[in-house]
């Protein structure tokens, strides 16, 4: 979804449509054949327009991810869907907010909301997976670990913002 959101050489409307379709496809359980096929078609079209070969390869490989998602346990599949739902929501917000050029995020609250959507939720996601799959992951309580994961992700996104502002 990062590739879709960040490919500024393609029209904003195309990127928004594909991001929405990816989100729809991700949340179908079981997958809808027609939607999955349309997503693959648009992804292939989108990939052909990529100038970076690794981004192109990533986009072309996307349809192979849907069966892998289905192979995950129900809990892990739900976690993937939740985190990608938050991320795509943040990316859609990015595209609508910054689609016509850079604009400042006006308040600390708006910055926190943004950094949580695109990165804090990722820290929570990985913490959740580790709690679920890594015995004795931490001696700290799970809630405290989730808060640390969230803060870590949000902090990394703030660093990305500073890096990108140069």
Task: Go through the PLM ranges and name each one.
Residues 1-166:
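Acidic catalytic motifs of isoprenoid enzymes
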């Amino acid at each position: 979804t990062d590739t879709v959101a960040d490919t500024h050489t393609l029209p904003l409307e195309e990127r928004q449509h594909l991001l929405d379709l990816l989100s729809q496809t991700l949340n179908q359980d079981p997958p809808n054949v027609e939607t999955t096929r349309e997503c693959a078609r648009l992804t292939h079209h989108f990939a052909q327009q990529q100038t970076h070969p690794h981004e192109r390869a990533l986009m072309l490989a996307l349809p192979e991810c849907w069966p892998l998602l289905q192979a995950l346990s129900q809990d892990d599949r739900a976690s993937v869907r939740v985190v990608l739902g938050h991320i795509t929501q943040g990316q859609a917000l990015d595209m609508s907010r910054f689609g016509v050029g850079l604009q400042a995020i006006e308040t600390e609250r708006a910055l926190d909301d943004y950094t949580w959507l695109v990165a804090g939720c990722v820290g929570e996601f990985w913490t959740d997976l580790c709690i679920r799959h890594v015995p004795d992951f931490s001696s700290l309580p799970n809630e405290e670990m989730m808060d640390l994961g969230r803060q870590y992700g949000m902090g990394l996104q703030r660093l990305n913002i500073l890096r990108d502002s140069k």
